[in-house]
Protein backbone atom coordinates (compact mmCIF):
# COMPACT_ATOMS: atom_id res chain seq x y z
CA UNK A 1 0.00 0.00 0.00
CA UNK A 2 2.77 2.43 0.88
CA UNK A 3 4.50 1.69 -2.41
CA UNK A 4 1.38 2.38 -4.47
CA UNK A 5 0.74 5.71 -2.67
CA UNK A 6 4.24 6.90 -3.16
CA UNK A 7 4.06 5.98 -6.83
CA UNK A 8 0.80 7.96 -7.29
CA UNK A 9 2.28 11.05 -5.62
CA UNK A 10 5.28 10.90 -7.84
CA UNK A 11 3.11 10.67 -10.91
CA UNK A 12 0.97 13.57 -9.84
CA UNK A 13 3.83 15.87 -8.94
CA UNK A 14 5.93 14.90 -11.87
CA UNK A 15 7.29 17.53 -14.32
CA UNK A 16 4.84 16.70 -17.01
CA UNK A 17 1.93 17.04 -14.72
CA UNK A 18 3.17 20.38 -13.37
CA UNK A 19 3.12 21.79 -16.87
CA UNK A 20 -0.53 20.91 -17.21
CA UNK A 21 -1.47 22.96 -14.16
CA UNK A 22 -3.30 26.35 -14.85
CA UNK A 23 -1.66 29.67 -14.48
CA UNK A 24 -1.95 31.70 -11.23
CA UNK A 25 -4.17 34.37 -12.84
CA UNK A 26 -6.84 31.88 -13.68
CA UNK A 27 -6.71 30.60 -10.09
CA UNK A 28 -7.31 34.04 -8.63
CA UNK A 29 -10.23 34.56 -11.01
CA UNK A 30 -11.78 31.34 -9.91
CA UNK A 31 -11.40 32.37 -6.29
CA UNK A 32 -13.23 35.63 -6.93
CA UNK A 33 -16.05 33.88 -8.73
CA UNK A 34 -16.37 31.41 -5.92
CA UNK A 35 -16.58 34.25 -3.36
CA UNK A 36 -19.29 36.00 -5.36
CA UNK A 37 -21.30 32.84 -5.57
CA UNK A 38 -20.95 32.33 -1.83
CA UNK A 39 -22.04 35.92 -1.10
CA UNK A 40 -25.08 35.61 -3.34
CA UNK A 41 -26.08 32.38 -1.70
CA UNK A 42 -25.72 33.87 1.80
CA UNK A 43 -27.68 36.98 0.75
CA UNK A 44 -30.49 34.84 -0.59
CA UNK A 45 -30.54 32.81 2.58
CA UNK A 46 -30.66 35.94 4.77
CA UNK A 47 -33.36 37.52 2.65
CA UNK A 48 -35.45 34.40 2.92
CA UNK A 49 -34.92 34.30 6.68
CA UNK A 50 -35.94 37.94 7.02
CA UNK A 51 -39.08 37.30 5.05
CA UNK A 52 -40.00 34.36 7.26
CA UNK A 53 -39.44 36.40 10.44
CA UNK A 54 -41.61 39.24 9.18
CA UNK A 55 -44.40 36.89 8.22
CA UNK A 56 -44.22 35.21 11.61
CA UNK A 57 -44.41 38.58 13.38
CA UNK A 58 -47.45 39.64 11.40
CA UNK A 59 -49.09 36.32 12.10
CA UNK A 60 -48.58 36.67 15.84
CA UNK A 61 -49.92 40.23 15.80
CA UNK A 62 -52.97 39.15 13.88
CA UNK A 63 -53.50 36.28 16.30
CA UNK A 64 -53.46 38.66 19.34
CA UNK A 65 -55.91 40.94 17.56
CA UNK A 66 -58.12 38.00 16.72
CA UNK A 67 -58.12 36.86 20.37
CA UNK A 68 -59.03 40.35 21.61
CA UNK A 69 -61.75 40.63 19.04
CA UNK A 70 -63.06 37.23 20.00
CA UNK A 71 -63.29 38.31 23.66
CA UNK A 72 -65.14 41.46 22.65
CA UNK A 73 -67.60 39.48 20.59
CA UNK A 74 -68.23 37.02 23.44
CA UNK A 75 -68.81 39.89 25.89
CA UNK A 76 -71.20 41.55 23.48
CA UNK A 77 -73.17 38.34 23.08
CA UNK A 78 -73.31 37.90 26.90
CA UNK A 79 -74.59 41.44 27.37
CA UNK A 80 -77.24 41.01 24.70
CA UNK A 81 -78.40 37.56 25.79
CA UNK A 82 -77.92 37.58 29.60
CA UNK A 83 -77.24 40.95 31.22
CA UNK A 84 -79.80 43.11 29.47
CA UNK A 85 -82.75 40.68 29.90
CA UNK A 86 -81.90 40.18 33.58
CA UNK A 87 -81.64 43.92 34.19
CA UNK A 88 -84.90 44.48 32.37
CA UNK A 89 -86.67 41.90 34.52
CA UNK A 90 -85.32 43.48 37.72
CA UNK A 91 -86.53 46.92 36.63
CA UNK A 92 -89.93 45.52 35.74
CA UNK A 93 -90.12 43.78 39.12
CA UNK A 94 -89.29 46.96 40.98
CA UNK A 95 -91.55 49.30 39.04
CA UNK A 96 -94.37 46.88 38.40
CA UNK A 97 -97.94 48.09 38.99
CA UNK A 98 -99.18 44.80 40.32
CA UNK A 99 -100.92 44.23 43.70
CA UNK A 100 -98.56 45.18 46.56
CA UNK A 101 -97.35 42.51 48.95
CA UNK A 102 -97.77 42.26 52.70
CA UNK A 103 -94.50 43.99 53.49
CA UNK A 104 -95.36 46.95 51.28
CA UNK A 105 -98.83 47.22 52.84
CA UNK A 106 -97.33 47.20 56.35
CA UNK A 107 -94.77 49.82 55.37
CA UNK A 108 -97.46 52.09 53.91
CA UNK A 109 -99.62 51.61 57.01
CA UNK A 110 -96.70 52.49 59.26
CA UNK A 111 -95.88 55.60 57.23
CA UNK A 112 -99.50 56.68 57.26
CA UNK A 113 -99.84 56.41 61.03
CA UNK A 114 -96.45 57.90 61.82
CA UNK A 115 -97.10 60.95 59.69
CA UNK A 116 -100.37 61.67 61.47
CA UNK A 117 -100.10 64.52 63.99
CA UNK A 118 -100.67 63.37 67.57
CA UNK A 119 -101.79 65.47 70.52
CA UNK A 120 -100.04 64.76 73.82
CA UNK A 121 -101.95 64.70 77.08
CA UNK A 122 -102.09 67.90 79.15
CA UNK A 123 -100.07 66.26 81.90
CA UNK A 124 -97.25 65.47 79.47
CA UNK A 125 -97.38 69.03 78.18
CA UNK A 126 -97.14 70.37 81.73
CA UNK A 127 -94.17 68.12 82.50
CA UNK A 128 -92.42 69.11 79.30
CA UNK A 129 -93.01 72.81 79.93
CA UNK A 130 -91.74 72.47 83.48
CA UNK A 131 -88.64 70.67 82.27
CA UNK A 132 -88.00 73.35 79.66
CA UNK A 133 -88.40 76.08 82.26
CA UNK A 134 -85.94 74.38 84.63
CA UNK A 135 -83.42 73.91 81.83
CA UNK A 136 -83.68 77.54 80.78
CA UNK A 137 -83.33 78.68 84.38
CA UNK A 138 -80.21 76.56 84.98
CA UNK A 139 -78.68 77.30 81.60
CA UNK A 140 -76.08 75.35 79.61
CA UNK A 141 -73.31 76.22 82.08
CA UNK A 142 -74.93 73.96 84.71
CA UNK A 143 -74.70 70.91 82.47
CA UNK A 144 -71.21 71.75 81.26
CA UNK A 145 -69.99 72.15 84.83
CA UNK A 146 -71.29 68.71 85.74
CA UNK A 147 -69.88 67.20 82.57
CA UNK A 148 -73.30 66.24 81.24
CA UNK A 149 -75.24 67.43 78.26
CA UNK A 150 -79.04 67.53 78.16
CA UNK A 151 -79.78 64.33 76.27
CA UNK A 152 -82.77 63.08 74.41
CA UNK A 153 -82.96 59.89 76.47
CA UNK A 154 -83.78 61.78 79.66
CA UNK A 155 -86.60 63.63 77.93
CA UNK A 156 -87.97 60.40 76.51
CA UNK A 157 -87.93 58.76 79.96
CA UNK A 158 -89.76 61.68 81.54
CA UNK A 159 -92.40 61.72 78.81
CA UNK A 160 -92.85 57.95 79.21
CA UNK A 161 -93.33 58.42 82.95
CA UNK A 162 -95.95 61.05 82.26
CA UNK A 163 -97.76 58.76 79.84
CA UNK A 164 -97.75 55.91 82.35
CA UNK A 165 -99.10 58.23 85.03
CA UNK A 166 -101.91 59.36 82.76
CA UNK A 167 -102.77 55.80 81.77
CA UNK A 168 -102.71 54.43 85.33
CA UNK A 169 -106.19 54.00 86.92
CA UNK A 170 -107.18 56.66 89.43
CA UNK A 171 -108.07 54.91 92.71
CA UNK A 172 -110.34 56.72 95.20
CA UNK A 173 -108.78 58.14 98.34
CA UNK A 174 -109.77 55.51 100.91
CA UNK A 175 -108.28 54.39 104.16
CA UNK A 176 -106.61 51.31 102.66
CA UNK A 177 -104.95 53.48 100.04
CA UNK A 178 -103.60 56.13 102.39
CA UNK A 179 -102.92 54.21 105.65
CA UNK A 180 -100.19 51.53 105.54
CA UNK A 181 -100.98 47.98 106.56
CA UNK A 182 -98.56 47.93 109.50
CA UNK A 183 -100.29 50.93 111.05
CA UNK A 184 -103.72 49.30 110.53
CA UNK A 185 -102.60 46.07 112.24
CA UNK A 186 -101.12 47.99 115.16
CA UNK A 187 -104.30 50.03 115.54
CA UNK A 188 -106.42 46.82 115.56
CA UNK A 189 -104.24 45.27 118.27
CA UNK A 190 -104.48 48.44 120.35
CA UNK A 191 -108.28 48.44 120.11
CA UNK A 192 -108.49 44.76 121.11
CA UNK A 193 -106.18 45.15 124.13
CA UNK A 194 -107.85 48.35 125.36
CA UNK A 195 -109.92 47.69 128.58
CA UNK A 196 -113.61 48.63 128.57
CA UNK A 197 -114.99 51.48 130.66
CA UNK A 198 -111.75 52.81 132.09
CA UNK A 199 -108.93 54.34 130.15
CA UNK A 200 -105.84 52.17 130.16
CA UNK A 201 -103.49 55.08 130.40
CA UNK A 202 -105.37 56.78 133.33
CA UNK A 203 -106.02 60.12 131.79
CA UNK A 204 -102.97 60.18 129.65
CA UNK A 205 -103.10 62.73 126.89
CA UNK A 206 -103.46 62.10 123.20
CA UNK A 207 -99.78 62.76 122.73
CA UNK A 208 -98.80 59.65 124.74
CA UNK A 209 -101.24 57.46 122.79
CA UNK A 210 -100.00 58.65 119.42
CA UNK A 211 -96.44 58.20 120.67
CA UNK A 212 -97.16 54.58 121.64
CA UNK A 213 -98.86 53.86 118.33
CA UNK A 214 -95.78 54.56 116.26
CA UNK A 215 -94.91 51.27 114.53
CA UNK A 216 -91.27 52.02 113.98
CA UNK A 217 -88.28 52.73 116.17
CA UNK A 218 -86.07 55.78 115.78
CA UNK A 219 -82.71 55.50 114.08
CA UNK A 220 -80.73 55.42 117.33
CA UNK A 221 -82.78 52.53 118.76
CA UNK A 222 -82.68 50.66 115.45
CA UNK A 223 -78.94 50.70 115.52
CA UNK A 224 -78.73 49.19 119.04
CA UNK A 225 -81.52 46.59 118.77
CA UNK A 226 -80.63 43.21 117.32
CA UNK A 227 -83.23 40.72 116.11
CA UNK A 228 -81.48 37.65 117.45
CA UNK A 229 -81.07 39.31 120.86
CA UNK A 230 -84.75 40.28 120.95
CA UNK A 231 -85.76 36.71 120.10
CA UNK A 232 -83.51 35.38 122.85
CA UNK A 233 -85.06 37.85 125.31
CA UNK A 234 -88.60 36.78 124.44
CA UNK A 235 -87.77 33.09 124.77
CA UNK A 236 -86.03 33.74 128.09
CA UNK A 237 -89.01 35.75 129.36
CA UNK A 238 -91.47 33.01 128.44
CA UNK A 239 -89.43 30.26 130.13
CA UNK A 240 -88.87 32.25 133.33
CA UNK A 241 -92.50 33.33 133.54
CA UNK A 242 -93.64 29.73 133.21
CA UNK A 243 -91.24 28.73 136.02
CA UNK A 244 -92.54 31.57 138.21
CA UNK A 245 -96.15 30.57 137.61
CA UNK A 246 -95.45 26.93 138.47
CA UNK A 247 -93.59 27.93 141.66
CA UNK A 248 -96.38 30.31 142.74
CA UNK A 249 -99.02 27.62 142.18
CA UNK A 250 -97.06 25.11 144.28
CA UNK A 251 -96.58 27.70 147.03
CA UNK A 252 -100.28 28.61 147.02
CA UNK A 253 -101.30 24.99 147.23
CA UNK A 254 -98.93 24.42 150.18
CA UNK A 255 -100.08 27.50 152.13
CA UNK A 256 -103.73 27.22 151.11
CA UNK A 257 -103.78 30.69 149.59
CA UNK A 258 -103.32 31.84 146.06
CA UNK A 259 -100.11 33.69 145.66
CA UNK A 260 -100.09 36.91 143.73
CA UNK A 261 -98.83 36.77 140.22
CA UNK A 262 -95.26 38.02 140.13
CA UNK A 263 -94.93 41.30 138.38
CA UNK A 264 -93.30 40.81 135.03
CA UNK A 265 -91.09 43.35 133.46
CA UNK A 266 -92.07 42.23 129.94
CA UNK A 267 -93.81 44.88 127.86
CA UNK A 268 -96.66 42.56 126.86
CA UNK A 269 -97.64 41.53 130.49
CA UNK A 270 -97.16 44.86 132.28
CA UNK A 271 -100.36 46.69 133.22
CA UNK A 272 -99.36 49.96 131.65
CA UNK A 273 -97.16 48.50 128.94
CA UNK A 274 -93.84 50.14 128.26
CA UNK A 275 -93.80 51.86 124.91
CA UNK A 276 -91.90 50.30 122.04
CA UNK A 277 -89.59 53.25 121.84
CA UNK A 278 -88.56 52.98 125.50
CA UNK A 279 -87.49 49.32 125.28
CA UNK A 280 -83.90 48.74 126.21
CA UNK A 281 -81.58 45.85 125.61
CA UNK A 282 -80.93 43.77 128.74
CA UNK A 283 -77.31 43.40 129.66
CA UNK A 284 -75.58 40.31 131.00
CA UNK A 285 -75.56 41.67 134.57
CA UNK A 286 -79.35 42.17 134.66
CA UNK A 287 -79.91 38.68 133.27
CA UNK A 288 -77.58 37.19 135.91
CA UNK A 289 -79.33 39.02 138.77
CA UNK A 290 -82.73 37.94 137.52
CA UNK A 291 -81.61 34.32 137.22
CA UNK A 292 -80.18 34.37 140.78
CA UNK A 293 -83.44 35.79 142.21
CA UNK A 294 -85.46 33.12 140.41
CA UNK A 295 -83.21 30.36 141.75
CA UNK A 296 -83.60 31.69 145.32
CA UNK A 297 -87.39 31.78 144.97
CA UNK A 298 -87.48 28.22 143.64
CA UNK A 299 -85.27 26.99 146.54
CA UNK A 300 -87.55 28.71 149.07
CA UNK A 301 -90.60 27.05 147.50
CA UNK A 302 -89.00 23.60 147.61
CA UNK A 303 -87.84 24.10 151.23
CA UNK A 304 -91.34 25.17 152.41
CA UNK A 305 -93.03 22.31 150.62
CA UNK A 306 -93.61 19.18 152.89
Swiss-Prot record:
It comes from the Eukaryota. It comes from Rattus norvegicus (Rat). Belongs to the FAM228 family. PANTHER family: FAMILY WITH SEQUENCE SIMILARITY 228 MEMBER A, PROTEIN FAM228A. The modification Phosphoserine is found at residue 270. This is Protein FAM228A. The keyword Nucleotide-binding does not apply. Keywords: Phosphoprotein. Residues 237-277 are annotated as: Disordered. The keyword NADP does not apply.
